[in-house]
Structures are given as C-alpha cells and as structure tokens.
Amino acid sequence: MSDTSTNTGRYQATFAKLKTEGRGAFVPFVTLGDPSPVLSLKIIDTLVQNGADALELGFPFSDPLADGPVIQGANLRSLAAGTTPTACFELLAQVRAKYPELPIGLLLYANLVFANGIDAFYAKAQQAGVDSVLIADVPVEESAPFSEAAKAHGIAPIFIAPPNADSETLALVSASGEGYTYLLSRAGVTGTDTKAGVPVEEILSKLKTFNAPPPLLGFGIAEPAQVTAAIKAGAAGAISGSAVVKIIETHQHDEAKLLAALGDFTRAMKAAT
C-alpha cells in the first residue's frame, strides 16, 4: 500500500470537514526556525491552537526571488539562528507527531530541493510527515522531475495558478496538482502593502471546470475581510504569509507578546472563514 492516499488524504479530509461546516480554510505561512527553532515550534503551536486549518511552511533561503522584504527578513532571522535543512525536517517531524490530522505543506525554492538531491529531499519530507510541496520558482511546465519524485513518496505536488494564466496553463495546473491549488491574487512579490483585490472569480470558475484541487488564495491576504471575500468568490480558503511574519518581526524579542498577537490574528482570520 502506498502512502499517497494518506498524504493528500489530510487535505481531502480537512476540506470535506470544512464543507460540512459551510466554511473555508485559513492557512498561515511561516518560515521554519524564525526567529529561532525553539520559538518557531511555539509559534506553530499557537497558529494551530487558534484555528489554523493547515500549515504552509518555508525552509530558510538567502535569495528568495518571489519574496518581499518581510519574508526575506524571516529567512535571514532563521539562518542567523542556525536553522539548517536538517533542523527543518526535525521541526516538521515534531509538528507532525503533535498534530496527526493537520495538513502540512512546504513552500520553497528549487535550489533547496536540488541541494539534497530531488529524490532524497522528497524522501526526507515524507519521513517528516509532510503532505505537500510547492516549489515557487518551478512553473508547472518544467515540474516533471519534482512531481515524479513527490508522487513516488506520497507527497502532493502543489502548483501556482497565476492571475494572468491562460486556459491552457490552468488546465495543466489542474491536471498536475494534488491536495490544493495555490491561487495568486496578484502577480509580483509577496507582501501585505498592496491589497489583494479579488477579481479572481473568472480563474476560479475555470479551475472548477478543469476539476482542479481546491483553490486557496494567497498573496497579500492580511485582514479578515479579504478571507471572507476570497471564500465568497469561490476559493476554498486563504493563505496568509507576510501578515503573519510581520507579527513575528514586530514582537521577535518579546515571546509573550508575540504569541498573544499571533493568537489574536489567527482567531480573527479563522472567524472570517
């Protein structure tokens, strides 16, 4: 028996449960090891205990092309704290042991996967209990070697549906992806300063036509109203990265304040689903 069913199974079970509740998913993103490996685990606990439906986690990387200054700051703090890929896999295994039902996704860059060897990376991810991997700088057209390794290890390959994608690309994303579809609300770098407008109904209806995995809207999701709007437009939920990481940046030297602020933010975002 392969593990494939169990891994996308966590996403399917989560989306099915949310559907019966008439709600969408709130999925926060953080960089593993930011601001330190020990505090990173407490941050993840806080997110999950305050309503996160799934997690999107990054490995620290010093040259993130798609990331704005906030996420770059997270990468640099994590690297400065000595977070290695091995430490990331150890953190992931701890999170998985604590939350057996929780979908855990990785969002990272191809260099990190190549550095390990593609197959070895996915094998380690599987051992740590990871459900999905999205490689931000590999478009679906070039993804075959990664997807094959992912599927061989029971991990869902996740693809980005860009806001300017044509039908052909959306069809390919829909056919190639498993778990969920990462829907960009706008092109550009991640960040919260530009509001995520949601003229995404058209893309959402195309994805539905192509029977894509459930779409989660990401990029620029920083307040509850945007979560509500995304779900109203037909998304299965929303991913928020920079807004979460901004809280870590602001309170990185005051653990109590940091965890309290993250708890408040997560509850407010989840309430909007």
Swiss-Prot record:
One annotated Gene Ontology cellular component of this protein: cytosol
Catalysed reactions, semicolon-separated: (1S,2R)-1-C-(indol-3-yl)glycerol 3-phosphate + L-serine = D-glyceraldehyde 3-phosphate + L-tryptophan + H2O
Listed InterPro entries: Aldolase_TIM (IPR013785), RibuloseP-bd_barrel (IPR011060), Trp_synthase_alpha_AS (IPR018204), Trp_synthase_suA (IPR002028)
Active site as annotated: 56, 67
Single annotated GO MF: tryptophan synthase activity
Keywords linked to the UniProt accession: Amino-acid biosynthesis, Aromatic amino acid biosynthesis, Lyase, Tryptophan biosynthesis
UniProt-listed Enzyme Commission number(s): 4.2.1.20
Annotated metabolic or biological route of this protein: Amino-acid biosynthesis; L-tryptophan biosynthesis; L-tryptophan from chorismate: step 5/5
Subunit-structure text: Tetramer of two alpha and two beta chains.
Function summary: The alpha subunit is responsible for the aldol cleavage of indoleglycerol phosphate to indole and glyceraldehyde 3-phosphate.
Record-linked HAMAP family: Trp_synth_alpha (MF_00131)
Similarity annotation: Belongs to the TrpA family.
Protein name: Tryptophan synthase alpha chain
Organism whose genome encodes this protein: Shewanella baltica (strain OS195)
Gene: trpA
